[in-house]
Each structure stands twice: as C-alpha cells, then as structure tokens.
C-alpha cells in the first residue's frame, strides 16, 4: 500500500473525526423560525409542520424562556394575521398593533439577550397573497413601489427594536431601498440587513405557506423567485445584494442548493452566509424518520452539517429546539 493511500489513521477515533471538520455545529449557528399570530393567547399546532405552532405574544415567555436557558441565541419572526383586513398594499404588515411589532417589543423586554430577526414580506398581508404591489388592473408586479413598501415595513420593524430585518420578497432593488431608509433613520449601524438573496421558486414551501397563510390567490411567484436551475442568476443576485448593502446573504432552500451556498462563500468571503432549511425539507426529514427510514437525530445532523460544510455560518431551522439538547449530549 502506498503511503499516500492511508487515510483512516486520521479519523479512526471520535475526536479525530471531529478534527476533520473545518467547522462544527454550535448552538449559536441556529436561528429558530417562530410564527406569530394576532390572537395573543394562541398556541395552535401546525398540521403540516409537526412539532411547530402558531404563537400569540402572551405565550412567548413560557415558550421561549426554557429554550433560551438551554442556549437559544436567535429567532426570526413571521407574522400570521388571522383577523386583520388585508388590502392591496399589505397595510397590516407594519401596523403598530400587529403581531410582529408587538412580538419584537415584548421579546426585547422579556429577553434582552435574545437576537431578534424579523422576516419582511407582504404576502401574508396583501389581499391577493403576492409579495408586492400589482400594476392597477393587472396581475403584474409593480417593482419600484413594491421595493419602497417593503423598505417601509423593514424600517418599522427596526424602529420597534428588531436586531435584524430579513426581506424575503425578492423584489428588485429592495435591499438598496431598505439600506437607504435605515441610513436616513440613523439605524443602519444598529440593525442587520439579511437578504434572502438566492431564494428559489421551490416546491418545498408548501407547509410554510399553510402555516403563514401566504398562498397566492392566483398564479405563482416564479416571476420574482429564482428558477431552480439558474445557478448563474443566483450568483448575480448575491453580487447585487452585496453591492446594495446586505450584511448577511441567505440561500433558500438549503439542501437542494448547496452548490449555490458554496458559490456564495466564494463570492462573499467576508459576509456571514445563512441558509434556510425550509418547511418542506424539515417535513421530509421528519416523515422519513417516522417511517423508519432513518433515525431523526442522525439525519438532522447530516443535513445541517452538509450546510456548514458548504459554507453556512447560520442555519434557519425548525430543528433548533432539538439541537439545543443534542449539542449538549
């Protein structure tokens, strides 16, 4: 046997196997997605997302307190308005009495050490279920005013106390619009801008759309989310968002797009890189484990470690509560 053929001596021991990883999973890498509804007492199971719930603001202390004591560092909030009147411009998105702003304010008071990100989009709040304004009398997105409206919502969340605003709408120009408003308001140095830069038009969003009530009333979102086979377009979107002032770059979904995540690491070596293990990915892992195909913990680790290997420094994951326990084991 050639000397260069011998590899196993370098990973025969569990500790030596850990050393083979450039980076290992830590609790601080995980950001937990939380669905916030406008019923302050809500605690409602989400059938399509096993183990996840819609929460009212008055339930957050009892829910998140134990997780924070286990080491939870960050959450990202998604509004689920059930009682508001939706309109063409998504007016409830930045309602001071809406679920996201109330949750930001409450969490800042309850848990000063918790990092709070807020997803910024209009689809949960518009009467048509799309992520921006429509040209009058048409079903075509009006990009420029959509980007400005998204920026207004982001600014409202920043003013409420969000540490991070994360626009997921995929409107052209929204990163620059948000950054400009944060600068003009004197908040650009106090609020992180995390861009869903490479967000693909994926079939893996179904459980989330049920959870958030964000299914479009007509058509789909393929005109503004990226085509799944468009690697070059994703690279251009990442470059654009860096130039427009994004502080963190995100790839979504995660597992089918690890090549894009690796591209992002090459394009933006100085930026933190996030990926979102989306609802469909989570549901598949849970379903496979329930069917006896594999053990849940094993597959949760394998998928998450593949994301870190590809370059992720931050993982948005519904498995976050489990990892708080698993990483202590």
PLM region spans:
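Alpha/beta enzyme core
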Residues: 13, 21-22, 26-31, 37-329
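N-terminal amphipathic/basic leader segments beginning at the initiator methionine
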Residues: 1-21
């Amino acid at each position: 046997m050639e000397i260069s053929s011998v590899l196993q001596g370098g990973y025969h021991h569990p500790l030596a196997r850990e050393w083979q990883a450039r980076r290992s999973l830590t609790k601080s890498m995980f950001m937990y997605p939380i669905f916030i509804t406008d019923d302050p007492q809500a605690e409602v199971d989400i059938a399509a997302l096993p183990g996840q719930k819609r929460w009212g603001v008055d339930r957050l202390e009892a829910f998140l307190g134990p997780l924070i004591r286990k080491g939870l560092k960050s959450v990202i909030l998604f509004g689920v308005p059930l009682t508001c009147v939706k309109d063409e411009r998504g007016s409830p998105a930045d309602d001071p009495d809406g679920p996201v702003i109330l949750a930001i304010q409450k969490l800042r008071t309850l848990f000063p050490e918790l990092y709070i990100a807020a997803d910024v989009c209009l689809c949960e709040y518009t009467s048509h279920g799309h992520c921006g304004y429509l040209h009058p009398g048409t079903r075509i997105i009006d990009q420029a005013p959509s980007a400005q409206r998204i920026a207004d919502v982001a600014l409202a969340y920043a003013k409420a106390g969000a540490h991070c605003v994360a626009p997921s709408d995929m409107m052209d120009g929204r990163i620059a619009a948000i950054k400009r408003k944060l600068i003009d308001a004197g908040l650009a140095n106090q609020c992180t801008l995390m861009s869903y830069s490479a967000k693909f038009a994926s079939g893996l969003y179904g459980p989330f759309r049920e959870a958030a009530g964000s299914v479009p009333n007509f058509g789909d979102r393929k005109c503004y989310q990226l085509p799944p086979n468009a690697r070059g377009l994703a690279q251009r979107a990442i470059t654009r968002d860096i130039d427009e002032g994004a502080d963190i770059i995100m790839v979504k979904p995660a597992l089918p797009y690890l090549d894009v995540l690796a591209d992002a690491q090459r394009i933006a070596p100085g930026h933190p890189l996030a990926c979102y293990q989306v609802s469909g990915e989570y549901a598949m892992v849970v379903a496979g484990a329930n069917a006896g195909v594999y053990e849940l913990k094993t597959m949760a680790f394998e998928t998450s470690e593949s994301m870190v290997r590809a370059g992720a420094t931050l993982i948005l994951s519904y498995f976050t509560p489990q990892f708080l326990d698993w990483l202590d084991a």
